[in-house]
Every structure is written in C-alpha cells, then in structure tokens.
Regions:
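Phosphate/nucleotide-binding beta-alpha loop and adjacent structural elements of enzyme active sites
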Residues: 1-193
Length: 193
C-alpha cells in the first residue's frame, strides 16, 4: 500500500489491517473497512477513530442484497467468542451464537470507485463467493489482493486469480516466496509480470 491508494478490508474485524492500511495510504488515500458484526464494529469504530481516511462499511459481502444469518461457534470449542470466527450461516447449522446482518454485493457497493489498489479479504471461508462476485472490480482495477484462505476453498481461490492473470506468493520472514501447492499461509496475489 502506497500513499494515495484506495483499499478495501473485507472482514475488517477489530481493525488491525485497516489501521495499518490507513497509515500507509495517508491523507490522500482511503480504506473501506467492511465489518457486518455490530459488537465488533463498535470496537472497530473506536480503533479507527483517528483514521480520517477510513470508512466503516457495515455489511457482509455476498451475491445478493438481503438480510442474512451469521453465526459464531467458537465458544463451543474454546470457551470464549473469537472475534474472527463469525461466518455466514447459509447452511442453517446450529451455532453457539447467531445474529442477523445485511448482505450487499461488493461489485455494487464499490462499483463507483475511481481506483482500487489493494484488497484484504479474511471472511471465514466465504472468500470464493465474494471474490467471484467482485470479479468485475478485480478485472477493472487489478488490485493487489491479500487473502486468508485454507481448506477446501484454497484451490478455487488460486484458480480464480490465476485465470485473472494474477500470480500468488506467500511471505516467509518478510520475503515473498512463490506459491506452492503445499503452502498453507495467507496468499498475496499480484498481476503477473
């Protein structure tokens, strides 16, 4: 992220990345911090209060504009609610906590942007859905994308970005390492050179 950049933090959570991006983008840049969970958004708002170039976007991103059920099942496993453990409960599974959020299409929410330089996406397994829906923005702006992905959706994410002309890498002690099939770290995608 460079001064003047426009960025989207999808799954902003408490704002760790959003604050850093805000500082790097500077007053000429902006960061849209997407966080659908109201109690987490309160903390996010406090954490971003000195970031004049940050805007909190109170939605879950997806393929439709509608109310959705989100859930958090971390208390059952760990004894406390993990703030980064919320997921779209489109399968109706039982969870320790459920709440309603508003889903919006990212391609519509951010469709009028004049530029998009960086996207961070960490949304508990919903990354494939959201990145496919935001494909028009990825094709138009070709932003660098940092994506947390693991398990079953990782090959789908890699295939999507490869098809779009991106190359993937991971970080190892501050150095970029080309993406391999056995890599499990978060992926940075940049347009291939």
């Amino acid at each position: 992220v460079r001064p003047g950049d426009t960025a989207i933090d999808i799954g902003a959570n408490l704002g760790y990345y959003a604050r850093t991006i805000s500082r790097l983008a500077g007053p000429a840049g902006c960061i849209y911090a997407v966080e659908p969970v109201a109690p987490i958004r309160k903390v996010l708002s406090r954490n971003l209060r000195r970031c004049a170039n940050a805007e909190i976007v109170p939605y879950a991103l997806g393929t439709e504009n509608k109310p959705i059920t989100m859930a958090n099942d971390s208390a059952r496993e760990t004894g406390y609610f993990g703030t980064g453990q919320n997921f779209v409960n489109d399968g109706g599974q039982k969870a320790a906590a459920e709440f309603t959020a508003q889903m919006r299409r990212g391609s519509e929410l951010f469709g009028k942007l004049e530029r998009l330089d960086f996207v961070k996406c960490d949304i508990e397994g919903y990354e494939v859905v959201v990145m496919n829906e935001m494909r028009p923005l990825l094709e138009k702006f070709r932003p660098t994308v940092l994506i947390e992905t693991g398990g079953a959706n990782r090959p789908q994410i890699v295939a999507l970005f490869t098809e779009l002309g991106y190359r993937g890498c991971t970080l190892d002690r501050g150095r970029e390492v080309p993406l391999t099939e056995d890599s499990t770290k978060d992926i940075i995608f940049r347009i291939g050179e």
